[in-house]
Every structure is written in structure tokens, then in C-alpha cells.
Amino acid sequence: KIMAKPSKFYEQLRGR
């Protein structure tokens, strides 16, 4: 899950 910088996670959620 998100434990470090949730940068990629957020980008994927936003759908880039």
C-alpha cells in the first residue's frame, strides 16, 4: 500500500 511517497499512487488514481 502507500507507505512512502504516494506520488505514483496518486498519479494512477488521477489517471494522469
From Swiss-Prot:
UniProt record, GO biological process: defense response to fungus; killing of cells of another organism; negative regulation of translation; xenobiotic metabolic process
Protein's job: Possesses antifungal activity against B.cinerea, M.arachidicola and F.oxysporum but not C.comatus and R.solani. Inhibits HIV-1 reverse transcriptase and cell-free translation.
Superkingdom of origin organism: Eukaryota
Higher taxonomy: Eukaryota, Viridiplantae, Streptophyta, Embryophyta, Tracheophyta
rRNA processing keyword on record: no
Protein name: Beta-basrubin
UniProt entry keywords in alphabetical sequence: Antimicrobial, Fungicide
Disulfide cross-links: none
